[in-house]
């Protein structure tokens, strides 16, 4: 979407940027279970911001809301600002028509897209399966 058409609440504030960077970054920590078992927790980095010249990561149900998250998609605008994806962009990634979920709140719309299947892929699979019947 054109940056000018994106509501301001989708932009990441400088005050929360450090949290986003931490959550998207690699982590390694010693942990202990309730039963006393010690283990190493680790997770690799997530591309931040998301690359626009590659396939998108999976949309998850926690995509909505303004809070920082390891799993939410973040893109860099032409002017260098960082922002979350809008509901329409999430719909487009899943090949739904624009505003397919417009009756719901933005958070619920993102949740719906996190639970959705990519429509075009399902259509192609079904056509292929029907030919084999």
Q: Which residues does each predicted region cover?
A:
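C-terminal target-recognition/interaction regions appended to catalytic cores
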Residues: 1-133
């Amino acid at each position: 979407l054109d940056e000018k058409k994106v509501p301001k609440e989708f932009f990441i504030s400088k005050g929360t940027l450090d949290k986003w960077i931490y959550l998207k970054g690699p982590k390694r920590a010693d942990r202990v279970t309730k039963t006393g078992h010690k283990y190493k927790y680790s997770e690799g980095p997530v591309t931040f911001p998301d690359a626009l010249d590659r396939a998108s990561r999976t949309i998850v149900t926690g995509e909505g809301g303004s809070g920082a998250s390891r799993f939410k998609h973040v893109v860099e605008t032409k002017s260098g600002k960082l922002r979350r994806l809008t509901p329409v962009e999430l719909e487009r990634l899943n090949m739904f028509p624009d505003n397919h979920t417009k009756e719901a709140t933005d958070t619920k719309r993102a949740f719906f897209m996190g639970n959705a299947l990519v429509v075009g892929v399902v259509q192609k699979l079904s056509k292929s399966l029907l030919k084999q019947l």
